[in-house]
Structures are given as structure tokens and as C-alpha cells.
Design a protein with these regions (language model features):
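Non-heme Fe(II)-dependent double-stranded beta-helix
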Residues: 1-13, 19-118, 123-126, 164, ...
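Conserved hydrophobic/aromatic beta-strand scaffold that supports enzyme active sites
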Residues: 15-17, 134-138, 151, 187-189, ...
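Non-heme Fe(II)/2-oxoglutarate
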Residues: 40, 52, 197, 204-289
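Feature marks short, surface-exposed loop/turn motifs that line or immediately flank catalytic pockets
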Residues: 26, 109, 143, 158, ...
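Short, conserved beta-strand element in jelly-roll/cupin
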Residues: 119, 126-144, 191-192, 199, ...
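Generic beta-strand structural signal
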Residues: 96-103, 114-116, 131-137, 147, ...
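Short, surface-exposed loop/helix-turn segments at secondary-structure junctions
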Residues: 51, 120-121, 173-184, 216, ...
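Double-stranded beta-helix
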Residues: 8, 142-205
Length: 289
């Protein structure tokens, strides 16, 4: 798993890349799922509970933004999410007892796949402590031209920013006046060959540029928490596996830390679509290089 130097880098930066960590056997299985889901999407004219489609999606030219609640959409995706290859790596950072939280597969389609503005994850699903991270794996080689995940080192140790606009609407993005306070010149593009894993602290500020290359950038994202980190508010996109213990033992006590951020909307009452919808309908800020 991770050596001490890698662990220290994660805790210092708020993120870590592990190049080529997922091998060919799993990548082939995951690619088979992607191919099947693209074919399935051709029958749709608009987004549904499984697929978030781009406005120009068609049967002839599919354009999928996201496979929602990925572990519920194919058995292979749940098998991967609980594989020791995955959960043992996460345990190196969060401890031996782990709970599954949520899952999505972002496609970032070729020739203009959406940019995502600077944001932090924890505001959408605050927990009783910050022992929560995202495990992302690039299914294909991903370089700067594909719009890789990009993070601002050290921001996980700073402010939990407000992600509502002045009208009180959830934007899923750090507002412009707060972006102006960030050292965006320190941004690191998290690139790597197929199978590269990106681990993101729940507080680190990150985003991604648009993909103007001729290849899509499929990225499977699973969120895990330490078993003693419990959600404070309803989960925006709960799966049938949300809250399932995937490693170790159930805790006897909850771990509590102060949460200084603003609480998100009541997703169980207002509904949740995605970060793409939130940033678009709330006048998404331009990508900041």
C-alpha cells in the first residue's frame, strides 16, 4: 500500500496521485461496463435517474456527463468499490474501519466536456469529522488536454468556503470573491496513465478544465468515510450501499469535530441533480487557470 512518504504528502497537500495503481484486469472489467452504459444511453433523449446527459446527447452521438449512483447501476462497480485493492488503500489514510458513502462515474466527453469550477466536497455532505475522502481512478490515460482533476495544495487546512450565491442558491462552487483569495497559481494537474488513482481530502479545493481533446476522460469516483464519521445531513445522492461497512468493524462511538461550514440544502426535500446542474444554473464561475 502507501509508504510513509506518500501518506505524509497526502496529509500535507490534501491529495495524492498513485500512478497506474489499478491493473489491466480491473480496467478491462470497468471498460466493459462503460461500453455497455454508453450503448444503453443511446435509447434516451433526456437525463434520468441513472444518466445525466449533456444537452447535445443523441443516439447517433452519445454525450454522457455522469453515471449517477454508479454502484447501483452495475454489479461490477460495487464489486470494485469493496475490493481490498481499493479499501486497503483508503484505510492507509482513514484507518482500518471504513464506510461506503457514494459513487459516480464522470465521463467528461471529448471535444468540449464540461469544466468544473473550484469547489470543496464536504459542504455537500458534511460529516461529524473530516475523515472522508474520494477515491478516483482514471480508466484511460489522462493528461492536461483531457481536463484532469486539478487541486490547490494545502487548502484542506484552510477555510470551509460558502458555496451559496448571494441569492441563497446552492452553486456547488467557491464564490468569486473567495476564489480571489486562493493561490490558484499553485494549482496542480493530477494526471497519469490508465489506472492512476487520485485521492482527495473532503476539504481540498479542486476542479477541472474542459476536455477539448478527441478522447473522453472517464473517471470513477467513490467516496469513503472512516466508520466513526457519520453524515450530519441527508446525503445528496444516496445509493443502496450508502453507509455500508466495507472494511473493519463497526465503531462503538462517533468521532466528533466542529464543523464550521454552512449546512447544505435539505437534499431529501429539494432534490439533488449534480454539480454540473448546480454550477450551470447558478451562473458557474469561469474556470480559473
Amino acid at each position: 500500500m502507501l509508504d510513509q512518504r506518500a501518506r505524509e504528502q497526502y496529509f500535507a497537500d490534501g491529495f495524492l496521485t498513485v500512478p497506474g495503481y489499478v491493473g489491466t484486469a480491473w480496467l478491462d472489467r470497468l471498460h466493459a461496463v462503460v461500453t455497455a452504459k454508453i450503448e444503453e444511453s443511446r435509447a434516451l433523449a433526456e437525463s434520468d435517474d441513472q444518466f445525466e446527459l449533456a444537452p447535445d446527447h443523441s443516439a447517433e452521438k452519445p454525450n454522457i456527463r455522469r453515471l449517477r449512483k454508479a454502484v447501483d447501476q452495475h454489479p461490477e462497480l460495487w464489486a470494485f468499490a469493496q475490493d481490498p485493492l481499493v479499501v486497503d488503500l483508503v484505510a492507509d489514510l482513514l484507518g482500518p474501519d471504513l464506510r461506503f458513502h457514494s459513487s459516480k462515474l464522470n465521463f467528461k466527453w471529448s471535444d468540449g466536456g464540461d469544466a468544473v469550477g473550484w469547489h470543496q466536497d464536504i459542504q455537500a455532505w458534511p460529516h461529524t469529522n473530516f475523515g472522508v475522502l474520494t477515491f478516483g481512478v482514471y480508466l484511460d490515460d489522462t493528461g492536461p488536454e483531457q481536463g484532469p482533476l486539478t487541486a490547490l495544495p494545502g487548502t484542506h487546512r484552510g477555510t470551509i468556503f460558502d458555496q451559496f450565491n448571494d441569492d441563497g442558491r446552492w452553486t456547488g462552487a467557491v464564490v468569486a470573491r473567495d476564489v480571489a483569495t486562493l493561490r490558484t497559481d499553485t494549482a496542480r494537474e493530477l494526471c497519469g496513465p490508465a489506472g492512476t488513482v487520485v485521492l482527495l481530502d473532503c476539504r481540498v479545493v479542486h476542479g477541472s478544465a474542459a476536455n477539448f481533446s478527441p478522447r473522453m476522460r472517464p473517471l470513477l469516483l467513490n467516496v469513503y468515510s472512516a466508520a466513526d464519521a457519520l453524515p450530519i445531513t441527508p446525503t445528496p445522492a444516496p445509493t443502496t450501499k450508502t453507509g455500508v461497512l466495507v472494511r473493519g468493524q463497526e465503531p462503538t462511538h462517533v468521532h466528533m469535530e466542529p464543523y464550521p461550514g454552512r449546512l447544505p440544502p435539505r437534499w431529501d426535500q429539494v432534490g439533488y441533480r449534480s454539480i454540473f446542474a448546480a454550477q450551470t444554473t447558478a451562473a458557474r464561475p469561469a474556470w480559473v487557470d
